[in-house]
Amino acid sequence: MVASLLCTVAVAVLAVAAVGGEAGVVEHTFVVHEMNVTHLCNTTKIFVVNGQLPGPTVDVTEGDTVVIHVVNKIPHGLTIHWHGVRQLRSCWADGAGFITECPIPPGSERTYRFNVTDQVGTLWWHAHVTCLRSTINGAFIIRPRDGKYPFPTPVKDVPIIIGEWWELDLVELDRRMRDGNFDDNPLSATINGKLGDLSNCSGIVEESFVLNVKHGESYLLRVINTAFFSEYYFKVAGHTFTVVGADGNYLTPFKTDMVTVAPGEAIDVLMVADAPPAHYHMIALANQPPEPDPQIPKYISRGLVRYTGVDANNNGLPVPMPIMPNQHNTMPSYYFHANLTGLMHPKHRRVPMHVDERIFIILGLGTICRGRNTTCKRQRSLETIEVATMNNVSFTHPNTTALLERYYDGTPEGVYTEDFPVRPPRPYNYTNPALIPPGPLEEVLEPTFKATKLKRFKYNTSVEIIFQSSTLLMSDSNPMHLHGYDVFLLAQGLGSFNAKRDIRKFNYHNPQLRNTILVPRGGWAAVRFITDNPGMWYLHCHFEFHIIMGMATAFIVEDGPTPETSLPPPPPEFKRCDAS
């Protein structure tokens, strides 16, 4: 079925390219359909795009127009989000379910059309309704218009998409988590959809991802984390990396033997095949919090780097394995991210030195009473449901309308309010270890309600946000993703943020530009940005369970003074919720 489907609807790629570097049009058709896949002795029905797992790579050049036709042949509604694409004045195409649009119904089609402006590097795309992004995802590569990189040009670039293999139906997984059940786990990590040969069932060894290389040549690995639950450590035995980019922006080259990538992040690394020709294992290992956090299985996938000219049994030699950190050691992730800085180049943007609005966001966890009850037995009883919060508010996601439509039409009543708190309701010691186990100290800080509270900004406002992890989260880090923007990551630190002490750590010279900010376990991150892109922009943690639990909000950015600084009306291909 898949083969005939792809023959008739095959990915239509129209690249009207560029003589003399002119922008073109890149056009694809994404057919979303069911497919049976067998792993670990069991056959699972999954949802994919064009018969591929991961899905097709969208490969464009800076300045191109992208047109994607999505055909929904699965029994569930879905949207496609272009993760990290700035969507300048094209918020209608962002693809955030119930934020910018209602889902594409089963049997229907939708076209996304947008420009790619002032971005170069690796982004990605994924489904943005329920848990479908586990298998509906792929790389989104933006190449420089002049074909020149600020680092040695690789002979080849290779997406390395790290994910998870779930046997549980993903729509059922979403339902279970919304009901407060967080006991389900994937069976394995994956590299480019392969579980790897460390996984087996009844003697049947799973297939590994294989990267074929030639000695002396360099390769650009585009490492993307699509997983629900974990950061990942990624290494190749006998090789080092030079980190050159992240989230569609260049970085100051940084040498390391290991990459750490959080859910939502995309990290670009150069790898030179300079080891003695042989086979070398690559490992993706999930980094998971230590006790007393709930302990989950070890997720790992093993792939292979294979040099040309080496026979299938590695000339009779053992295949080297990389030495990995302890899976519960979170500090390598902190140090990796802290060592990254933005690359100074002619087009780099400068940090706003003046701040118009300062926001302090505490990332927390707690319980509320189930149903419409206002009182209930606490201490994680069956009368409560666990929620995640930002400044003590757990976000209620709409499920019948889209926030962008309501904002554009001027009809927010009964759907959202614009009173998202810009600071926590009560200060406390946010990283007090005594708050980790549930108990009376934690209970007085817990939220009491869910709501759809948004924050509105005037156009061209300079905003500073301090994200603070709390021990109410136990030991989770938090990859916070802001749609529609790149933000300057000024600093990260451990412990509770202290302005007098920590502002001196801010990097105003060459900070990273990121769309996904990893707020470290028991620590904080400081960002700044200018609200120069009007629309409705979703802000959320990229751990799937935190999204479902309510660690989210949306920013409304008003129109500027001119048509060129304003959100245009919905394009002809946009389908309103009542017409979906």
Swiss-Prot record:
Any single Pfam family the record assigns to this protein: Cu-oxidase
Recorded GO MF terms: copper ion binding; hydroquinone:oxygen oxidoreductase activity; oxidoreductase activity
Residues involved in Cu cation 4 binding: N478, C541, H546, M551
GO cellular component: apoplast
Protein name: Laccase-20
Catalytic activity: 4 hydroquinone + O2 = 4 benzosemiquinone + 2 H2O
Domain of life: Eukaryota
Keywords from the UniProt entry: Apoplast, Copper, Glycoprotein, Lignin degradation, Metal-binding, Oxidoreductase, Repeat, Secreted, Signal
Domain Plastocyanin-like: 31-147, 156-310, 419-561
Family note: Belongs to the multicopper oxidase family.
Chief location bin: secreted
Keyword Methyltransferase carried by entry: no
Known cofactor(s): Cu cation
Sites where a glycan is attached: N36, N42, N115, N200, N339, N373, N392, N399, N429, N460
InterPro entries in UniProt: Cu-oxidase-like_N, Cu-oxidase_2nd, Cu-oxidase_C, Cu-oxidase_fam, Cu_oxidase_CS, Cu_oxidase_Cu_BS, Cupredoxin, CuRO_1_LCC
The species this protein was found in: Oryza sativa subsp. japonica (Rice)
Binding site for Cu cation 1: H81, H481
